[in-house]
């Protein structure tokens, strides 16, 4: 049995990890670190855990040993947290859910943990950078195109995300009275996840140098991401669909539907649902996923499973909300 720790366990991604790890068959102990909730029971931050866990948050990581440590601090905090908890020199699997290590900079040894693109590289790795939620959805929509070398023209993306994608810190755009029955565009053509998407595209199709044109939107719901992607594609409809089916044949969490992809089919699961169509000369792909599970904490558990040699679906057999 394995010993896990979560640093930043009181937030949305930390709480989702806590729920997953408390029910993971290979995890014996979960240590939950929170500077804001130290000494308080888990249910103070996550009321739904009242019936499932009686433990309390701690202020600092114990000496361990730990088999895996998840970093769930804010963006720009992970280097400080690794230093504060003396993780740099430990031979412990560290999975970072922030954006701090997603791009290679010559100074860190984290690998990018998108299992559907780089899963074969993850077994035995000790440092994994978890992808962003929008980046996960967009990449799942276009990975087969890049793998075939079919990207040639600009990729146009419209995406909508739930309010939990912005974290727990109070913002004007997270108030119920603003978010409810409302829509807005933010960071058009400049979203921070574009850099990691481009890095993957450069790996899979080096000759493709265009920047995806991405319009992100805030949605009036709490969980979920839907992205709609279209680009020119010379492949026929049948060839296009066969390429997607072949690419994801061994991917347990990615599924193509012949119906319209929708959020309620995937919210609360680690699944991603794809709709793949050809309209004239354009390929149109829709990807739906849960931003907190497949787009964050569930993907982190998937990465843990791969890195530690566990069955990759272990602990991730979750029930969708459905309606």
What residues fall within each predicted segment?
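C-terminal active-site/capping subdomain that shapes the small-molecule cofactor and substrate pocket
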Residues: 227-323
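Predominant activation on well-ordered alpha-helical scaffold segments within soluble catalytic domains
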Residues: 18, 139-146, 194-198, 241, ...
């Amino acid at each position: 049995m394995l010993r896990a720790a979560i640093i930043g366990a009181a937030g949305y991604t930390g709480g989702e990890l806590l729920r997953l790890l408390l029910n993971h068959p290979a995890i014996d102990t979960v240590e939950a670190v929170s500077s804001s909730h130290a000494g308080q029971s888990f249910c103070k931050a996550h009321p739904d855990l009242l019936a499932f866990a009686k433990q309390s948050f701690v202020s600092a990581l114990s000496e361990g040993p730990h088999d895996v440590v998840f970093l769930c601090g804010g963006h720009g905090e992970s280097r400080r947290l690794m230093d504060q908890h003396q993780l740099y020199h430990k031979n412990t699997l560290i999975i970072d859910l922030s954006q701090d290590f997603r791009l290679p900079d010559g100074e860190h040894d984290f690998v990018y943990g998108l299992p559907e693109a780089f899963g074969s590289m993850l077994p035995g790795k000790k440092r994994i950078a978890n992808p962003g939620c929008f980046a996960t959805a967009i990449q799942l929509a276009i990975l087969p195109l890049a793998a075939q070398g079919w990207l040639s023209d600009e990729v146009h993306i419209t995406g909508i995300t739930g309010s939990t994608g912005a974290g727990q810190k109070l913002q004007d755009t997270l108030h119920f009275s603003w978010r409810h029955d409302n829509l807005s565009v933010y960071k058009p053509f400049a979203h921070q996840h574009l850099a990691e998407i481009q890095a993957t595209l450069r790996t899979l199709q080096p000759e493709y140098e265009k920047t995806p044109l991405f319009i992100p939107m805030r949605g009036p719901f709490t969980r979920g991401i839907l992205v709609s992607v279209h680009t020119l594609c010379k492949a026929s409809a049948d060839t296009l669909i066969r390429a997607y089916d072949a690419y994801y044949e061994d991917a347990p969490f990615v599924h193509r539907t012949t119906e319209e992809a929708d959020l309620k089919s995937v919210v609360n699961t680690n699944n991603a649902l794809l709709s793949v169509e050809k309209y004239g000369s354009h390929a149109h792909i829709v990807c739906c996923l849960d931003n907190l599970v497949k787009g964050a904490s569930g993907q982190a558990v998937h990465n843990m499973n791969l890195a530690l040699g566990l069955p990759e679906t272990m602990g991730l057999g979750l029930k969708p909300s459905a309606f």
